[in-house]
């Protein structure tokens, strides 16, 4: 959520910056609503002051023995007018808040301006794609031949975009998640967290999934003691970041760095017909998430470091990748700046996204009222929040299967995973 004062005072500037990400801010409508708000605010305050002044005169009139009935009638009339104005003002503020909640974050000035993913900027590459002397198979053919990926029975149990993993491939999937968690907690300084997979509406509003992306969520019917429905998490970013909601963190406790391995659930409402084959785009998938809460002046450096933490996973697995900075037109709703990490998939002969690392600045923290208190400050300030995949486990499995395949259809186990797989060197 943008700073309401900035939005009001810098409406044209805000509209120009939002236009670079393809969002058209209705400046005329907002301007009219803001003028109406100011007018209502003034008239409400004037009515309140008049009512208070006349109410005080009742006691004085009684002391003089005067008839207070006309004064009481006037107070009643003013009270009714005031109540009506308050209702009108509240409705207008709700309308303005609804607009504010639907406006995406302002792109950081360092984000390249562009319309779509074709204008993203590659900033580095690591590793060299292997040249195979045989025809490469994709992960679906490899996994099904080895008996480790069962799409047919997953469809029978649930539907499309689900998977059953078995045997050593299921074990490798688990090993990848354990390896990622161990790396981030022992070498990168993150604290592991176990979090709920179901969250309430306030949490989804806090991190920006609601109100705009409700159709991409799986919702439950009202079933809690509080009587509200819950939603399955689309990413562990939601519960991890919301831990700081309605909190004030001491400056000495920053940065807060958390990681969690969870299943994630997405309806993929806007992805009909895309990546229908294999594990690339599933309704349920595992991910190791990285979240940081930092002081504003530290957030851009923290983004570089968080992205590096995700890249280290691929480096240790020996998987070639490239890192791109997203242009303004391709960034997510709440991001001020984003780096995407794309891993090489031989069967597709291209790089595919495996991690997205974003600096949200104070966009989420303003929604959540997540703040910190500096020693020298009289009042708390909004935190900056960052998140990234460290990594998507299923897509990492895809990359390992395809990059480590052998001509006979077997898979060489990357050295860093062998300790998690009982010393196993090859699958198949």
Swiss-Prot record:
UniProt key word Amino-acid biosynthesis: no
Annotated L-serine binding sites: 235-237, 289, 389
Keywords: Aminoacyl-tRNA synthetase, ATP-binding, Cytoplasm, Ligase, Nucleotide-binding, Protein biosynthesis
Reactions mediated catalytically: tRNA(Ser) + L-serine + ATP = L-seryl-tRNA(Ser) + AMP + diphosphate + H(+); tRNA(Sec) + L-serine + ATP = L-seryl-tRNA(Sec) + AMP + diphosphate + H(+)
GO annotation (BP), single: selenocysteine biosynthetic process
Record's subcellular location: Cytoplasm
Domain of life: Bacteria
GO function term, MF aspect, one: serine-tRNA ligase activity
Keyword Ligase: yes
Any one of the GO CC terms: cytoplasm
Recorded metabolic or biological pathway in which this protein acts: Aminoacyl-tRNA biosynthesis; selenocysteinyl-tRNA(Sec) biosynthesis; L-seryl-tRNA(Sec) from L-serine and tRNA(Sec): step 1/1
EC number: 6.1.1.11
PROSITE patterns: AA_TRNA_LIGASE_II
Positions bound to ATP: 266-268, 353-356
Family: Belongs to the class-II aminoacyl-tRNA synthetase family. Type-1 seryl-tRNA synthetase subfamily.
Function of the protein: Catalyzes the attachment of serine to tRNA(Ser). Is also able to aminoacylate tRNA(Sec) with serine, to form the misacylated tRNA L-seryl-tRNA(Sec), which will be further converted into selenocysteinyl-tRNA(Sec).
Notes concerning its domains: Consists of two distinct domains, a catalytic core and a N-terminal extension that is involved in tRNA binding.
Subunit structure: Homodimer. The tRNA molecule binds across the dimer.
UniProt protein name: Serine--tRNA ligase
Provenance organism: Shewanella piezotolerans (strain WP3 / JCM 13877)
């Amino acid at each position: 959520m943008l700073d309401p004062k900035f939005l009001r005072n810098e409406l044209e500037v805000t509209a120009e910056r939002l236009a670079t990400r393809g969002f058209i801010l209705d400046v005329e409508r907002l301007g009219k609503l803001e003028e109406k708000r100011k007018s209502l605010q003034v008239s409400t305050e004037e009515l309140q002051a008049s009512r208070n002044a006349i109410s005080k005169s009742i006691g004085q009139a009684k002391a003089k023995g005067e008839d207070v009935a006309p004064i009481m009638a006037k107070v009643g009339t003013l009270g009714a007018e005031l109540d009506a104005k308050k209702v009108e003002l509240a409705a207008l503020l709700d309308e303005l808040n609804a607009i504010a909640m639907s406006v995406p974050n302002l792109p950081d000035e360092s984000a390249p301006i562009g319309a779509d993913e074709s204008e993203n900027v590659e900033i580095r590459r690591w590793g060299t794609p292997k040249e195979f002397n045989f025809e490469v198979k994709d992960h679906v053919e490899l996994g099904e031949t080895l008996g480790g990926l069962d799409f047919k029975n997953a469809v029978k149990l649930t539907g499309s975009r689900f998977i059953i993993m078995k045997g050593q491939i299921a074990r490798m999937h688990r090993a990848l998640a354990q390896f990622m968690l161990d790396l981030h907690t022992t070498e990168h300084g993150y604290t592991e967290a176990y979090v709920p997979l179901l969250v309430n509406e306030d949490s989804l509003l806090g991190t920006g999934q609601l109100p705009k992306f409700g159709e991409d969520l799986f919702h439950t019917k009202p079933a809690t003691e509080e009587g509200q429905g819950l939603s399955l998490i689309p990413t562990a970013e939601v519960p991890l970041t919301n831990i700081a909601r309605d909190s004030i963190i001491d400056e000495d406790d920053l940065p807060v760095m958390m990681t969690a391995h969870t299943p994630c659930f997405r309806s993929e409402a806007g992805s009909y017909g895309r990546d229908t084959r294999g594990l690339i785009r599933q309704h349920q998938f595992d991910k190791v998430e990285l979240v940081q809460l930092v002081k504003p002046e530290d957030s851009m450096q923290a983004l570089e470091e968080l992205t590096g933490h995700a890249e280290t996973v691929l480096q240790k697995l020996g998987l070639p990748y490239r890192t791109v900075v997203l242009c303004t037109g391709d960034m997510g709703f709440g991001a001020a700046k984003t780096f995407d990490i794309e891993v090489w998939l031989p069967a597709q002969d291209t790089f595919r996204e495996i991690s997205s690392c974003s600096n949200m600045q104070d966009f989420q923290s303003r929604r959540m009222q997540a703040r910190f208190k500096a020693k020298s400050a009289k009042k708390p300030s909004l935190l900056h929040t960052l998140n990234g995949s460290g990594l998507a486990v299923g897509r990492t499995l895809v990359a390992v299967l395809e990059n480590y395949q052998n001509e006979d259809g077997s898979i060489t186990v990357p050295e860093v995973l062998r300790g998690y797989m009982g010393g196993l060197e090859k699958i198949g």
